[in-house]
């Protein structure tokens, strides 16, 4: 189940709010400029589906986002517990960073924890299958895929270079809960 846990940045052990209804998650995140939606596939997606099949299943929603926000590049990222670089990738994504463009992810399968550091608060968004999250450019955040990752996500970019991070050097992520496997 998708969830949103809100903390004050100085109290990682004490959540201020825990939400599990998609509408509540979406409205709370909208207050800080983050988009959260639930999508349904237009066609069933089989295990092991190709990038093209995944994109085709969500073509209507993807095209709508491209028109609305000017995204030019779409791809599919898939990571599981057999990936040879899972530990290195997890460590990299767990460092607080920001991007010069929106970070848009739609979870086709599995789950991941997006943690957003906005002003004095930390918003931990557990994204699962059918969740779309759009983190605005410049937002400090980190991502945890867990020790045993399993996710397939559609990514949209307005930068043809794809994922380009600017790391903040802040170790705040080390003080907050990780994704439980």
UniProtKB/Swiss-Prot annotation:
Chain positions recorded as Fe(2+) binding sites: 97, 99, 103, 141
SUPFAM superfamilies for this protein: RmlC-like cupins
Pathway the protein acts in: Amino-acid biosynthesis; L-methionine biosynthesis via salvage pathway; L-methionine from S-methyl-5-thio-alpha-D-ribose 1-phosphate: step 5/6
GO molecular function, one term: acireductone dioxygenase [iron(II)-requiring] activity
Site entry: Important to generate the dianion: 105
Top-level division of the source organism's lineage: Bacteria
Function: Catalyzes 2 different reactions between oxygen and the acireductone 1,2-dihydroxy-3-keto-5-methylthiopentene (DHK-MTPene) depending upon the metal bound in the active site. Fe-containing acireductone dioxygenase (Fe-ARD) produces formate and 2-keto-4-methylthiobutyrate (KMTB), the alpha-ketoacid precursor of methionine in the methionine recycle pathway. Ni-containing acireductone dioxygenase (Ni-ARD) produces methylthiopropionate, carbon monoxide and formate, and does not lie on the methionine recycle pathway.
The protein's assembly and partners: Monomer.
UniProt name for this protein: Acireductone dioxygenase
Enzyme class: oxidoreductase
Keywords, sorted A to Z: Amino-acid biosynthesis, Dioxygenase, Iron, Metal-binding, Methionine biosynthesis, Nickel, Oxidoreductase
Record organism: Pseudomonas paraeruginosa (strain DSM 24068 / PA7) (Pseudomonas aeruginosa (strain PA7))
One example of a Gene Ontology biological process annotation: L-methionine salvage from methylthioadenosine
Annotated cofactor note: Binds 1 Fe(2+) cation per monomer.
Chain positions of site May play a role in transmitting local conformational changes: 102
CDD domains in the cross-refs: cupin_ARD
Catalytic activity: 1,2-dihydroxy-5-(methylsulfanyl)pent-1-en-3-one + O2 = 3-(methylsulfanyl)propanoate + CO + formate + 2 H(+); 1,2-dihydroxy-5-(methylsulfanyl)pent-1-en-3-one + O2 = 4-methylsulfanyl-2-oxobutanoate + formate + 2 H(+)
May play a role in metal incorporation in vivo (site feature) positions: 96
Binding site for Ni(2+): 97, 99, 103, 141
Source species taxonomy: Bacteria, Pseudomonadati, Pseudomonadota, Gammaproteobacteria, Pseudomonadales
Family as reported in the entry's similarity comment: Belongs to the acireductone dioxygenase (ARD) family.
Keyword Kinase belongs to the record: no
E.C. no: 1.13.11.54, 1.13.11.53
Family annotation (InterPro entries): ARD, ARD_bac, RmlC-like_jellyroll, RmlC_Cupin_sf
Amino-acid biosynthesis is among the record's keywords: yes
């Amino acid at each position: 189940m998708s969830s949103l846990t809100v903390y004050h940045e100085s109290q990682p052990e004490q959540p201020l709010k825990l939400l599990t209804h998609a509408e509540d998650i979406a409205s709370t995140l909208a207050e800080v400029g983050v988009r959260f939606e639930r999508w349904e596939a237009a066609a069933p997606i089989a295990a092991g589906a190709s990038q093209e099949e995944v994109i085709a299943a969500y073509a209507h929603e993807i095209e709508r986002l491209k028109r609305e926000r000017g995204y030019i590049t779409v791809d599919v990222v898939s990571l599981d517990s057999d990936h040879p670089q899972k530990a290195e990738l997890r460590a990299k994504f767990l460092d607080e960073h920001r991007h010069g463009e929106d970070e848009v992810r739609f979870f086709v399968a599995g789950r991941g924890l997006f943690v957003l550091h906005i002003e004095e608060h930390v918003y931990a968004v557990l994204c699962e299958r059918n969740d779309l999250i759009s983190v605005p450019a410049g937002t400090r955040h980190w991502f945890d895929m867990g020790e045993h990752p399993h996710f397939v996500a559609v990514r949209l970019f307005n930068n043809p270079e794809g994922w380009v991070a600017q790391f903040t050097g802040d170790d705040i992520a080390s003080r907050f809960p990780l994704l439980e496997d």
